[in-house]
């Protein structure tokens, strides 16, 4: 392992011990805010500190085994122990490097997931419905909660656009790589000649941001329109102008919300989504500037980001960012997404490790 990485690990291990001592101090316990902040820091440092301690122990085992090689009677056993210890050290070094990667503070947050039908008319709206169902099933498997914020249904089913808030542990960290263009190739139910059609949808995933961190929005920059809800919603639909459309004039970002019967609730939801969208756009712009020399696996939610192709006749899904093809389309559409998410998370970590190595 590089000396610069060992030095970083030593500093983090020392800080872990320092924080542990501070947490036992009466003055810290009396100051609840400081105690909470230090408790969080202690939890964040615990894994790396424990792994580093184990790695140091393995280094000692390697030294002991190397010394034993000089003894003819112990040589065979020493060679075996040395081989095992080196393999353990290598495994731990990989773990430590991943633990050293910069954490995205948004990863643990809830997320807004937007699915929009693109080219392909009714078929694109149906596919948007299929994608939303896929994400909902995945959320269910992880015990996350799905709340529809706004839905604009397609004429023959599916959605022209649907926005949902998904709440639970680590939602954004798992779903953030879904942002971008998703393409479907299949024979529509209305196609009499059996021809395969290609349609597209875009997905945008944004972390839900606490109110204190939302960008300041000048009320003068907003145009707020009210209109009557359309689509599913029972007897209360079309009786009042409860639906809200907010346009942020400087950026042109538009958010609609018509899920609630109350105009006030729809407005609050729309403003929450708008704030997250503006922040996401600012972050994407910054990332684009930073990643101009390096590929960026995190999509912007723009249709030009071609993430995946879902080919129904062949039963396959291809992730174009990492050249991965899986022939388990039915499972994936039922929400078994880990086989697609895990490889891209690993690839992203490998890119981060390469960036870390460049810095050193």
From Swiss-Prot:
It comes from the Bacteria. It holds the Pfam family RF-1. Methylated by PrmC. Methylation increases the termination efficiency of RF1. It is found in: Cytoplasm. The modification N5-methylglutamine is found at residue 235. The keyword Protein biosynthesis applies. Residues 285-313 are annotated as: Disordered. One of its GO terms (molecular function) is translation release factor activity, codon specific. GO terms for cellular component: cytoplasm. Keywords: Cytoplasm, Methylation, Protein biosynthesis. InterPro entries: PCRF (IPR005139), Pep_chain_release_fac_I (IPR000352), Pep_chain_release_fac_I_sf (IPR045853), Prokaryotic/Mito_RF (IPR050057), RF-1 (IPR004373). SMART domains: PCRF. Belongs to the prokaryotic/mitochondrial release factor family. Peptide chain release factor 1 directs the termination of translation in response to the peptide chain termination codons UAG and UAA. PANTHER family: LD18447P. This is Peptide chain release factor 1.
């Amino acid at each position: 392992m590089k000396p610069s990485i060992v030095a970083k690990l030593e500093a983090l291990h020392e800080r872990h011990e320092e924080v542990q001592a501070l947490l036992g101090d009466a003055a810290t316990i009396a100051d609840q805010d400081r105690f909470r902040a230090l408790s969080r820091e202690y939890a964040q440092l615990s894994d790396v500190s424990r792994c580093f301690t184990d790695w140091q122990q393995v280094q000692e085992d390697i030294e002991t085994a190397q010394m034993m090689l000089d003894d003819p009677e112990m040589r065979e056993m020493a060679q075996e122990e040395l081989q095992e210890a080196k393999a353990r050290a290598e495994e731990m070094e990989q773990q430590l490097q991943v633990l050293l990667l910069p954490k995205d503070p948004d990863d643990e947050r809830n997320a807004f997931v937007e699915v929009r039908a693109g080219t392909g008319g009714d078929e694109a709206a149906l596919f948007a419905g299929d994608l939303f169902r896929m994400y909902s099933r995945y959320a269910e498997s992880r015990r996350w909660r799905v709340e529809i914020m706004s839905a604009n249904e397609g004429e023959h089913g599916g959605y022209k656009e649907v926005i949902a808030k998904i709440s639970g542990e680590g939602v954004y960290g798992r779903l953030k790589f879904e942002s971008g263009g998703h393409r479907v190739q299949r024979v529509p139910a209305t196609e009499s000649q059996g021809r395969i059609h290609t349609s597209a949808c875009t997905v945008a995933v944004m972390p839900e941001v606490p109110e204190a961190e939302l960008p300041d929005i000048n009320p003068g920059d907003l145009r707020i329109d009210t209109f009557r809800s359309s689509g599913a919603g029972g007897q209360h639909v079309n009786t009042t102008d409860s639906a809200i459309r907010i346009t942020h004039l400087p950026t042109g970002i538009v958010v609609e919300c018509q899920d609630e019967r109350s105009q006030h609730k729809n407005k609050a939801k729309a403003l929450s989504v708008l704030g997250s969208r503006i922040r996401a756009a600012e972050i994407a712009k910054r990332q684009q500037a930073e990643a101009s020399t390096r590929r960026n696996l995190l999509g912007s939610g723009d249709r030009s980001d071609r993430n995946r192709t879902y080919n129904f006749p062949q039963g396959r899904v291809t992730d174009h960012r990492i050249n991965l093809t899986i022939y388990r389309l039915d499972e994936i559409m039922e929400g078994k997404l880990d086989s697609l998410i895990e490889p891209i998370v690993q690839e992203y970590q490998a890119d981060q490790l390469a960036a870390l190595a460049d810095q050193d």
